[in-house]
Amino acid sequence: MSKEEKLAIAAATDGACSGNPGPGGWGALIRFQDGSEIEFGGNSPETTNNRMELQAALFILEKLKNIKFAPSLTIKTDSKYLIDGMDKWMPNWKKKGWKTASGKPVLNQDLWKALDHPELPKIKLQYVKGHSGEKDNDRVDAIAVAFSKGRKIQLKDFANN
């Protein structure tokens, strides 16, 4: 079965930062109906944990543009910042010219605007408590931390599932 034929049924993202700001990393995964999964990660030398959370979500949404996914698919995240930004704050930020309720410029505006791009799929975010034993969240956390610390970590892809 090729990547294009697989049906994505779950996704998860996380961000981490060693110091805040400091070196950061993000992790993401997509789980497929056939039991396979694919993992991704990246880093930035000087960033914040919130930027890494947003970067992970943006990356996974970009990937899901080109993958068939179940209508029930959600993206699991332990970031209330990401969830509240997408679900509660963004409409008001846009109305106010990307300013907060106090009139200050929205932080991480470049990433928020990218997440709001109309070509990205609209997928529900699902809050999961971090470090709680939730398998996908624990895995993307391990990926994010490894990337933030410059450690090597084996990422699953279609060749090594």
UniProtKB/Swiss-Prot annotation:
Disulfide bonds: none annotated. Mg(2+) 2 binds at residues 14, 141. The keyword ATP-binding does not apply. Pfam families: RNase_H. Monomer. Residues 5-149 form the RNase H type-1 domain. Its EC number is 3.1.26.4. It is found in: Cytoplasm. Endonuclease that specifically degrades the RNA of RNA-DNA hybrids. Binds 1 Mg(2+) ion per subunit. May bind a second metal ion at a regulatory site, or after substrate binding. Belongs to the RNase H family. It comes from Prochlorococcus marinus (strain NATL2A). InterPro entries: RNase_H, RNaseH-like_sf, RNaseH_domain, RNaseH_sf, RNaseHI. One of its GO terms (cellular component) is cytoplasm. Its cofactor is Mg(2+). It comes from the Bacteria. GO terms for molecular function: magnesium ion binding; nucleic acid binding; RNA-DNA hybrid ribonuclease activity. HAMAP family: RNase_H (MF_00042). It catalyses: Endonucleolytic cleavage to 5'-phosphomonoester. Mg(2+) 1 binds at residues 14, 53, 78. This is Ribonuclease H. The keyword Hydrolase applies. It is an enzyme of class 3 (hydrolase). Keywords: Cytoplasm, Endonuclease, Hydrolase, Magnesium, Metal-binding, Nuclease. One of its GO terms (biological process) is DNA replication, removal of RNA primer.
